[in-house]
Amino acid sequence: MNIENTAIRKGRKFDQVLAGARDVFLAEGFSASNMDHVAKAAGVSKATLYSYFPDKESLFIVVVQTECARQSDEAMEHIDQSAAPAVVLGNAARHLLGFMTSEFGQRMFRICVAQADRFPELGLAFYQSGPMVVREKIGAYLRGATQEGQLHITDFDLAADQFGELCKADIFPKILFGVQTVFEPSELDRIIDGAVSTFLAKYGV
C-alpha cells in the first residue's frame, strides 16, 4: 500500500467516515480494527466507506494526517508570534505537550511504532504530518525572531529540533514505556518552564 499512489475521493460523508474511523482506531487500535467496525461507527454503508478508502491502511493514514494537521496548526497559527520569545515558545510548548500527552497522540504513536515493520507508511505519515510540520513552523518563527533581533540562531532546523526535544524531557520516556500516561498540569508546567529557560539561555539575546 502506497498512500502517494492512492486517490482519496472526498464527498458528503467524508468527514463522517473520518470521525467514525478515529473513534474505532482509538478504541481498538490498528490490528484489531476492521472496515466493518468503521462503517458501523461512522453510520455509513460499506460501499460508501470503500468508495472513499480502498483499505484500512489508507484510512488510518488520512485520519492521522487530518488530526496532526489540526494540531500542528494550533501549535503556532493560533499563537501571537509578535509576543516576547518566552511567551511564544511557552505557548508552543504547551500545544506540543498537549498533543503528546493526549489519548490520540499516545495511541497513534504506539500504533505507528507497532506497525513500523509491516507498514512503514504509517509511521512516515505520522512523522510528516506531525513532528515535521511543527518543526518547520517553529523553525520559521525562530528565523523571524532572529531577524527581529530577539534571538541569536544560525541553524534554525537544529534549534527547532532542540526545542522539541527539551519539551519531551521526562514526559516522553514515561509515555514510551507506559510508565505514566496521564500528567498533572504542574508536571507539564515544570517541563515547559525548563524547556523555555534552557532554550533562551542558549539562544536568547
Where are these regions (language model features)?
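Amphipathic alpha-helical packing segments from all-alpha helical-bundle domains
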Residues: 87, 98, 107, 111-113, ...
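C-terminal peripheral helix-coil segments that are non-catalytic and often amphipathic
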Residues: 1-4, 91, 95, 136, ...
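Helical hydrophobic small-molecule/effector-binding pocket
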Residues: 86-118, 122, 167-171, 201
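Hydrophobic/aromatic residues within well-ordered alpha-helical segments
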Residues: 13, 56, 67-68, 89-92, ...
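Amphipathic alpha-helical linker/stalk segments
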Residues: 63-92, 98-100, 104, 108, ...
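Membrane-interface starts of transmembrane alpha-helices
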Residues: 152, 156-160
